[in-house]
Amino acid sequence: MDLTGLDTSSTSNPRRTRTGRRAWAATVAAGVVAAGLLSGPAASARPAPDPSLTTMSITSPPGGANVRVLLFYGSAAGGEESPLVNAGIAAIERIGQTGPENQRFTVTSTGDASVFTNDKKLSRFNTIVFLTGGGDVLDPEQEAGLEAYMEAGGGFVGLHDAARAEPYSDWFTGLIGARPAAGQATVQRATVEVGDRVHPATRSLPPEWKRPDKWLNWVKNPSGDVHTVARVRESTYRPGAGANGWDHPVSWCRDYDGGRSFYTGMGGTVSSYDETDFREHLRGALLWTTRLVRADCKATITGNYKAERLTKPNQPGRNDQIGEPHGLVTAPDGRVFYIGRGGADASQPVVTDWNDPAVGKGRGEIHVYDPKTKEVTLAGALTVFGNKGGGDELTKVEEGLLGIELDPEFARNGWVYLHWTPHSGIDRDKRMAERRVSRFTLDHATDKLDLSSEKVLLKWPVQIHSCCHAGGGMAWDSKGNLYIATGDNNSSGFSGGYSGNNPEPNYKGVSFADARRTAGNTNNLNGKILRIHPEPDGTYTLPEGNLFTGKETDEGGGKTRGEIYVMGVRNPARISVDPETDILYAGWVGPDAGAPSATWGPAKYDTFAVITKASNRGWPYCMGNKQPYRDRNLPDPSKPLGWYDCDHPKNESPNNDGLVNLPPVTGSNIWYAPQGGGPDFPRDENGVPSYKQDEATYRLPWLKGGGQAAMNGPVYRYDDAGSSDVKWPAYWDGKWFVGDFYDADQPRNAVLMDPRTQGDGGLPVHSESLKKIVPVGNDGIKNLMGWTFGPDGALYVLDYGRGFFTSDARSALWRVTYTGGGPTPAADRLARGTQ
């Protein structure tokens, strides 16, 4: 094609056949050879072209307000173009002539690579599209021209087999982002996870996009080096040899060598270009690369984040920086308040003898980190029951200072809410204690708590003969309701690691191995998420919409507590509320069984849930997606009885003083076991899973457990009006952060939920690994103990340290900031001045 008259676009006859010096058809015939050249890293690659190969001077940035796109379809062999090329040309021409007037553009298509050595012609194009086959489609001088074009701020879009072009060029590999593995893909229908909900190429697409294409595998997964906007879900098709696993990028972008590059592995079929959604995908890519709109192509590039430790190791014999980490919250002015549970009290020894009045006495500490001074202040310390060291279930303890929240009007009133177990409230004879939620007042000038200002809002009994499961997290909604997470106050033993439902073990008449006494009991505040409305005088009222009113007359009345919003949770250490939607998010630790049992039920499942309404989450009757446990009871708890009915659970424990007939169980969104994420099994006619390991399928392939302890995180909300230069990008807006205390295969991810299904146990539609952003490993944040976003948009994280029931030199507060800069291109380099 003659490129002299560039104002003449090829849109007038979108279906006409073009003849170029290299034809697509010949490339397809030679595809096996081209693929072989790209089959692995051993292929000999050449570096970026020597700048001396060209003296071109490209206008910076290329193209102007009369936006033009150059579509190059050259290939390594000559001949007629293929129907695929013609379909792609027609689609891009159509895209350029639709949409708002200020987002339209003209298209010039050519198979003549000499255009890349003509700086005047090249300077007129805002973007170059490669609709090429494989092979060496550019000679060194032509590639040098393309490089000069990108360095001047040009745009590039690569489609499908463009990733096979220039197989010996490192620079072109960087431009594309990845190379296909050997072999030719066949057309298969699959699900594309559209994780980027803000990029113009993806924001209008469904989160789960089902479509047919030729799905390429990558020699080296580009995740972390590029910004992935969509990935293909391998469980929905047969990826074949060289599969990339759950993280299989299919479309991505990045700022590259001065310009903007977008690549999609889709577009390998003629029918792709007839799809409205696929054309919208290409349209968004072209709008960004032509500089018609700005977009962020940096958000998931892991090098754009900085993790820094904020606190120093404690001085010997002092907890001047941090206690045994157990939760954090940020104030509107950026201060970070974090608590120590009560272990590692440097001022006194661990006492485990119940005859000693000091048994379990510890200091629950509240520290404050000030980002302005970068100094830490010990705001106060409560005398808690919580310092018994490690050991077995009848020695160790998880009570202490468990949770912290700041009043919604904290900047004005200084009110701090603490969830804790005062040492003064223990009964050593009965081995019972009082748990409470108290309000204290902080002096803003000194960052000191006035311990005499305590107002006790809520208190309830807990058994302390046996460890464990205290919960602790708290969170506010926009209506001033306070959510309080409590554990089931139950031993992990006596049930083989399955349902905590052994009614027999007790101490002076109080069961410590039967979670039906607590989590499954409508009349007990343990194993719950409570919801109350604190009042200024230190009392509370009950909001409408809790699971019970406390006034139910069922089964004789007096068998419910109106504070209960959620029942049936085991150990919810962390909860959060999305400030935009008021939806509650929670995670809880499961039991200890290493494998499922056809006799007793599922293996240990750690769990995350999106909670949109008051509900029963199942413990100790059901876990995961409503997988039941086996009942047991007196006189012989070792003998299995019937399977629990998740839709009609009954509490028939002798330790129950609440309702027998319970609300139906709501399934969870995320659950995982040592074998993998989202284990599921075939079910019989009664809905009971087989629980046979060799019949398991894993619905969440991006995680698994082992040692596991779910650590719920926040939902990120991007502050568009904020001026912070460290805030995480808008890409993360609305994504839910889910993690685990451990850092191997366990989750440390941000997930995207479907609002239509999330309240009924719907699975995440997309998951993004954070392990290279919130760094794992001994020198990173190995033992995640809490995380939240501050008003600056940075992520604040607690690392528990490397021991248990203590702090050590690795116990620390960290901050993870974004350093990648804003969207591109710069506002003053937009092609038409405004977006």
Q: Could you say what each language-model-derived stretch is?
A:
Residues 49-64, 94, 237, 242-249, ...:
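Extracellular ligand-binding/catalytic regions of CAZymes and related secreted enzymes
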Residues 54, 99, 178, 183-258:
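Catalytic beta-strand/loop cores that center a nucleophilic Ser/Cys/Thr
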Residues 330-333, 406-412, 476-479, 578-581, ...:
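Residue-level detector of Asp-centered blade-edge/turn motifs that repeat once per structural unit
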